[in-house]
């Protein structure tokens, strides 16, 4: 248990009346005005018996210092005493009469009577502006709960629900008000939306073309197109009958060009029907254009060559002396003539 001790104000009165501390005295006992020696000993060094007897007595009274056991610390004693004086609600400093410089520095204080003591030191009374701001903050809550005639007819449960919601409704949550059938339907629509509309159910896509003007009001729903007829035609045409395979085979014909015989399948290629343009260009796709181009190929790449054993080969043509050139000369004679020409040119030079 902490030891009960005398409070600071009666303790100070006792120290002043004892006249044991030099410089501590009453200036006006009727008005409870007194002075305390307040030397700045840090400048010239501490003299405990002269500069800090009051601070030492307060440290001993509060148990912060034990004579003969603790080392003297007048600087700490003075700081603790100043903090205790500033925390008292019934003692205030008379600053216009205090002298804080020089060798005879002191501070003057006054003990306040009971009638002048504030209820709690440090707490300022509320101003009119703070009261007005608080009143304005309470008005919107009261006005939202009141009816058009100024009389509030809402129950406390509904008031708590309304203040918690604050007109913020989630589109995925349905808010249900229980036990409020007596409320007006118009007020319910204004305060709470019990069934908010479900959104994001239909995705709309806009299309534009050269013929049609761009208009944001003309919206078309997004649809998945069915399988095109071109894909169906591919599946049906991929499986051909034996007759079609026979018709698709190339027919080889004999042809002779400049006395030489060749095998050719020109003019026997089958024509393949391609899907019409209506398959790709429809009224739903006004901007789509498809161009199909087929390169000419004299012979299919996947066809095989027929055997040549059944076909008669032409007899080899042997050259005859009549077919040779009459002015044909041997290689040796040509070399001899050229050598004679070069020698003649050298001599002429």
From Swiss-Prot:
The lineage of its organism: Eukaryota, Metazoa, Chordata, Craniata, Vertebrata. There is a cross-link at residues 137, 260 (Glycyl lysine isopeptide (Lys-Gly) (interchain with G-Cter in SUMO2)). The modification N6-acetyllysine is found at residues 75, 78. Acetylated by CBP/ p300 during cell-growth. Acetylation on Lys-75 is required for stimulation of H4 promoter activity. One of its GO terms (molecular function) is DNA-binding transcription activator activity, RNA polymerase II-specific. It is found in: Nucleus. It comes from the Eukaryota. The modification Phosphoserine is found at residue 225. This is Interferon regulatory factor 2. Specifically binds to the upstream regulatory region of type I IFN and IFN-inducible MHC class I genes (the interferon consensus sequence (ICS)) and represses those genes. Also acts as an activator for several genes including H4 and IL7. Constitutively binds to the ISRE promoter to activate IL7. Involved in cell cycle regulation through binding the site II (HiNF-M) promoter region of H4 and activating transcription during cell growth. Antagonizes IRF1 transcriptional activation. Its main location: nucleus. The gene is Irf2. One of its GO terms (cellular component) is cytosol. PANTHER family: INTERFERON REGULATORY FACTOR, INTERFERON REGULATORY FACTOR 2. There is a cross-link at residues 137, 166, 293 (Glycyl lysine isopeptide (Lys-Gly) (interchain with G-Cter in SUMO)). Interacts with BRD7, IRF2BP1 and IRF2BP2. Interacts with CREBBP in growing cells; the interaction acetylates IRF2 and regulates IRF2-dependent H4 promoter activity. Residues 5-113 bind DNA. GO terms for biological process: defense response to virus; regulation of transcription by RNA polymerase II; toll-like receptor 3 signaling pathway. Residues 230-239 have a biased composition (Polar residues). Residues 230-253, 303-349 are annotated as: Disordered. Keywords: Acetylation, Activator, DNA-binding, Isopeptide bond, Nucleus, Phosphoprotein, Repressor, Transcription, Transcription regulation, Ubl conjugation. It holds the Pfam family IRF. Induction: By viruses and IFN. SUPFAM superfamilies: Winged helix' DNA-binding domain. Belongs to the IRF family.
